[in-house]
UniProtKB/Swiss-Prot annotation:
Its EC number is 6.1.1.4. GO terms for biological process: leucyl-tRNA aminoacylation. Its main location: cytoplasm. GO terms for cellular component: cytosol. Keywords: Aminoacyl-tRNA synthetase, ATP-binding, Cytoplasm, Ligase, Nucleotide-binding, Protein biosynthesis. Gene3D superfamilies: 2.20.28.290, 3.10.20.590, HUPs, Isoleucyl-tRNA Synthetase, Domain 1. It comes from Colwellia psychrerythraea (strain 34H / ATCC BAA-681). This is Leucine--tRNA ligase. The keyword Transport does not apply.
Amino acid sequence: MEAIYNPQAIEATVQKFWTDNNTFQAIENPDKEKFYCLAMFPYPSGRLHMGHVRNYSLGDVISRYQRMQGKNVMQPMGWDAFGLPAENAAIKNKTAPGKWTYENIDYMRNQLQSLGFGYDWGRELATCKPDYYRWEQWFFTQLFEKGLVYKKNATVNWDPVDQTVLANEQVIDGRGWRSGALVERKQIPQWFIKITDYAEELLDDLDQLTEWPEQVKTMQRNWIGRSQGVEMTFAVADSTESFDIYTTRPDTLMGVTYVALAAQHPLAVAAAVDNADLAAFIDECKNSKTTEADMAAMEKKGVDTGLKAIHPLTGKLVPVWAANFVLMDYGSGAVMSVPGHDQRDYEFALKYGLAIEQVIAGQEADDINKAAITEKSTLINSGEFDGLDFEEAFKAISDKLISENKGKTTTNYRLRDWGVSRQRYWGTPIPMINLANGESVPVPTNELPVVLPEDVVMNGTTSPIKADPEWAKTLYNGEEALRETDTFDTFMESSWYYARYCSPNDDTQMIDPAKANYWLPVDQYIGGIEHAILHLLYSRFFHKLLRDVGLVKCDEPFKKLLCQGMVLAETYYREADNGAQEWIAPTDVEVERDEKGQITSSISKIDGQPVLSAGMSKMSKSKNNGIDPQEVIEKYGADTVRLFIMFTSPPEQTLEWSDAGVEGAHRFVKRVYKLAHEFVESTNNSAVVDIAELTLNADHKKLRRELHKTIAKVTDDIGRRNTFNTAIAAIMELMNHLGKAKVNSDEDKAVMQEAVRAVVLMLTPITPHLCHHLWQLVGGSDENVEDASWPVVDNSALVEDEKLIIVQVNGKVRAKITVAADASKEDVEALGLNDESVLKFTDGNTIRKVIYIPGKLLNIVAN
């Protein structure tokens, strides 16, 4: 009998068994309830980090649990393989992005397999392979034909030295990351998909997602940003020109003292011809950042265009300014400014000496001379609209604008169309052809895929396909033409991969509708909350597009969403001579702690000198505090890593890495191993008598009661609540009871066998290698644990023959008595009143009242 737990040997053997037997191959079976579990696929960056391990451990535990519930489970894995990091690594390592990516995929696949995740590897996909992205290209051409794709000029970051477009993260303090040149804002043609056509449905269908975190749904609602407002027209004085503005606060219209245009607004550009200050300001704005966060933080600037706008209701002339806080890409590129009731407008008006008028009554403490009054209230100084509240004023003012053909009520969305063009190399080529006449047409279906050449040299500036004029040359209807040399935003690939998993090897169609409609929607999706908006919103949008061309039937891609927390680790550093922090890996630090676990000393293992602790922070390369999963697996085994990950904190919360915690998890795994082996030894390999044939004593019944209470709790914790940590804690508590139990009589062995089998089954989703091995010892059949059913609660075992009753006298505990479970109130009162310990406090007193809470408490009031 094996006395020592050897995780490496067990795990290698079990993983080979799974591979040889295609244990986790998923096949459609209409007679069986399906369960599609998916964790967000990784970018193949080189090595798995602990965040990956946590994400994929959660998915695997859920998948294995659902399999044991008798469901037909699919859990696939693949690679989100396009993206900028591959280009940067290719430049650094002087290799092609494709080669670097495929090598990383091979290494990370081995890491995932070493952790024992039950993936159907026959469904593996990589988004950088033509057999995947050809269908993305095909689908884009279908969207173009449906009128859902268009091309327009949009602003990008332009490096004038490297002559290339930069991603936002490549702009550091306004300069190009390689050249150091001041980055310019430049307009270039880009492709867009009309996600705004689906804005209302994307918003309304959030109500269907009852098993998504409210936080994620709120973030998406805010991003889509539906608002009810009024669109109105301002005419330009002494001109035939006019412009539209949209506002959600028409109640403040009578307080407009100026209007603000985006610097790129056609009226501002035209006015700049004769206005040098305005022209200079427009040039300055070209290089300004345009994210909402950047704009909120930057100094608000503007220049008077010299134009006057005519107030649509009063006819009053108001100045027209060009301002850097108005974006041409948002709305009409013009806003009405009401400094009395908008703080940004207020500060701008103070800065440039513009009028501030109060048209909304404030609270007593409000002072228009100190700040804008932004709350909604009663109108004042608004002529015929005085005395109206917000709702009344909204209707009255919009009605008047409509009656005079100067405005209309409208629903607006903050959401903007999805710009999918990227001026990068390592991505899916956009399947469009630019003709000599300026028209753009889709690549014919029979010429797809447009294959990205992978044998390239990265020079750090221009994309290889942009630098190679021969690659772009093509023919269209016999005429010379040029291919589009932009590639897709990598969110395109990750927006439909979940659906491709349903038929990943189909080379005749994007998705097999029959298979997709069997597996979809995904029953459980798992990933970080940082993907709450873009990835999850784009996937929901893409799914509706797939539905509308008949490839899927359901409205939403992901039924239930779990957002796991980050993995944290201790961080250590020294201050360099220049004041910078030099981060030191936790594995290179010797730490001493007090009895509360607080660090009292941290010494470098390398030079023996003290280092400083910066506390817990997210594992990252920048802080050098990552823990390599491979090293922990090699030391303790994958099951220990999985158990630690699942036990240390609830899935939505942050997980603090702890070497002591890993040691504790390892000890528990060894305890389970030892208990099972010792039980088998105690039976001398002879059959255990069926528990149904035996008469159990009180101790046996108590142990069975603990067992079945544990099964009930673990089933609920894993299956409904997803509180894996409390499920494991319950199993640990049960193990404490089992460790004290005798294994001598037939009854002892029968109860212990039932308990050991249940423990192995309950731990199977969490520590699958160990449990596969132990089930062969204790399972009692030829069935492998992967095909075993989840343990079922025996309700009869939960029935108690006796109850422990607490007896109080005047509110203080004086005795504990054991009574029959079906004892009457009178019997319990008699036993309690005559208990020796109770009589000490009631003798000589009058019993005033006896209160009995059935099965729990007897309270005697005596004086």
